[in-house]
Amino acid sequence: MASRLLRGVGALASQALRARGPNGVSVVRSMASGGGVPTDEEQATGLEREVMLAARKGQDPYNILAPKATSGTKEDPNLVPSITNKRIVGCICEEDNSTVIWFWLHKGEAQRCPSCGTHYKLVPHQLAH
């Protein structure tokens, strides 16, 4: 078992030595522009890159992050983004509660959870695309 491992390591080492040019410089091109392993920013493409750039600016275009909780009073309600004029909302009410209270939230004034009285307000939201 150990001899197989040593033979495998020896083969890899000889391949690495053959990959060098006549002057001893490596012929293999690195993936990153600066050399070495690319960073997440250099490697990300598409939607992942768009989300990373938005996060760097402090934005959340696809609602990936949890909403910021407020006190939930009538003067400072929890803001619920929606692309329509109504949205269904789930309230846990208490920290150790295992039941979710679901209710419809409509555009306009802040509305209360029927169970605990926490206030929620629907705010318009535009999609990123």
UniProtKB/Swiss-Prot annotation:
Chief place of localization: mitochondrion
Protein name: Cytochrome c oxidase subunit 5B, mitochondrial
Family affiliation: Belongs to the cytochrome c oxidase subunit 5B family.
The protein's annotated pathway: Energy metabolism; oxidative phosphorylation
N6-acetyllysine: modified positions: 68, 86, 121
Function: Component of the cytochrome c oxidase, the last enzyme in the mitochondrial electron transport chain which drives oxidative phosphorylation. The respiratory chain contains 3 multisubunit complexes succinate dehydrogenase (complex II, CII), ubiquinol-cytochrome c oxidoreductase (cytochrome b-c1 complex, complex III, CIII) and cytochrome c oxidase (complex IV, CIV), that cooperate to transfer electrons derived from NADH and succinate to molecular oxygen, creating an electrochemical gradient over the inner membrane that drives transmembrane transport and the ATP synthase.
Keyword annotations from UniProtKB, A to Z: Acetylation, Membrane, Metal-binding, Mitochondrion, Mitochondrion inner membrane, Transit peptide, Zinc
InterPro entries: Cyt_c_oxidase_su5b, Cyt_c_oxidase_su5b_sf
Compartments where located: Mitochondrion inner membrane
Gene Ontology molecular function, alphabetical: metal ion binding
Gene Ontology biological process: mitochondrial electron transport, cytochrome c to oxygen
Superkingdom to which the source organism belongs: Eukaryota
Residues involved in Zn(2+) binding: 91, 93, 113, 116
Binding partners and assembly: Component of the cytochrome c oxidase (complex IV, CIV), a multisubunit enzyme composed of 14 subunits. The complex is composed of a catalytic core of 3 subunits MT-CO1, MT-CO2 and MT-CO3, encoded in the mitochondrial DNA, and 11 supernumerary subunits COX4I1 (or COX4I2), COX5A, COX5B, COX6A2 (or COX6A1), COX6B1 (or COX6B2), COX6C, COX7A1 (or COX7A2), COX7B, COX7C, COX8B and NDUFA4, which are encoded in the nuclear genome.
Transit peptide, from-to: 1-31
GO cellular component: mitochondrial inner membrane; respiratory chain complex IV
Topology in the lipid bilayer: Peripheral membrane protein
